[in-house]
Amino acid sequence: MSLSEQAILEQDKNIVSNIVQDILCEQISIEKTELNLDLYIYEDLKIDSLDLVEIIKQIEEKFDIKIDDSKILYMNTLEEFIDFTLQTIYMKHGFEYLQNKQF
């Protein structure tokens, strides 16, 4: 992977991370400063199934994707969830999608 590809990947991850964190903060009433990527989704953030359904719905609408609910159960940390969301975006829209879209 070239340096420019790595930079674009980091930029894309930052875009997705910021949006996912904004959605989380709104849904579970937490301050963004309290979040870090190592937090466990269920244990640390205390996200229940109803919260998760709403969070996924908002992410799907924001990025025009469909998240495979069955795979969410295997994600532990916020970073794993963000990485999975980014992969799902790339699979549906390609690598240029986030660079060409205004969020």
UniProtKB/Swiss-Prot annotation:
Pathway named in the protein's UniProt entry: Lipid metabolism; fatty acid biosynthesis
Key words of the record: Cyanelle, Fatty acid biosynthesis, Fatty acid metabolism, Lipid biosynthesis, Lipid metabolism, Phosphopantetheine, Phosphoprotein, Plastid
Lipid metabolism in keyword set: yes
UniProt GO cellular component terms: cyanelle
Location relative to the cell: Plastid, Cyanelle
Residue numbers carrying O-(pantetheine 4'-phosphoryl)serine: S49
Matching InterPro entries: ACP, ACP-like_sf, PP-bd_ACP
GO molecular function, one term: acyl carrier activity
Domain of life: Eukaryota
Domain Carrier: 14-89
Record bears the keyword Nucleus: no
PTM section of the record: 4'-phosphopantetheine is transferred from CoA to a specific serine of apo-ACP by AcpS. This modification is essential for activity because fatty acids are bound in thioester linkage to the sulfhydryl of the prosthetic group.
Function: Carrier of the growing fatty acid chain in fatty acid biosynthesis.
Family named by the database record: Belongs to the acyl carrier protein (ACP) family.
Listed name of the protein: Acyl carrier protein
Gene source species: Cyanophora paradoxa
